[in-house]
Amino acid sequence: QSYFEDTDISVFHELMNLDYFSVVYFTKAMLNHMVKEGSGHIATNTSVAGLIASRERTAYSSVKFALHGFFDSLRLEVMKHNIAVTLIAPGKVVTNFGDNKLDAQGKPFGEKNMGEAYGMSPAKAAKFILSAIKHKKRQIVISKWSDVAWLGVFINKFFPSLYFFLARRINT
């Protein structure tokens, strides 16, 4: 977690390899089996950070936006094979994710954010995820209704200028 100007480019490479290319490679390995079967369902975890911009998340958000672009394109390609694609975009969920965040030099950041303390419980998030997969939803945002992240996704989708106006004023 850091501003782009302070972030070593190696952090981008590390995150792309870990959070993007590993998912693409795994999908490539599994897709042929699904095509041969004539059906399947790909469900992958992304993030609200792949749907809305946030300061100090340039590296992380770019990876998550890349995943959304990849899977949205893939969805169009595999529909003809009866293969569904579900993107799971968590907002604030109580996790230990902050223990693994990296700073500008690629070292552990070591600071939890509000979502890790006050977000949705993992059990409740799992129920939403399982329901989305069962019903072959295109995408699900996992977040409390009161969560700014959910509201941010909504505002950004329908009122992008308003989103950036507000985002400049809110310290996220």
Residue ranges of each PLM-predicted region?
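A short helix-coil junction within the Rossmann-fold of NAD(P)-dependent oxidoreductases
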Residues: A29-G38
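SDR active-site lid
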Residues: K80-S146
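Substrate-binding pocket helix/loop in short-chain dehydrogenase/reductase
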Residues: Y3-F4, D8-H13
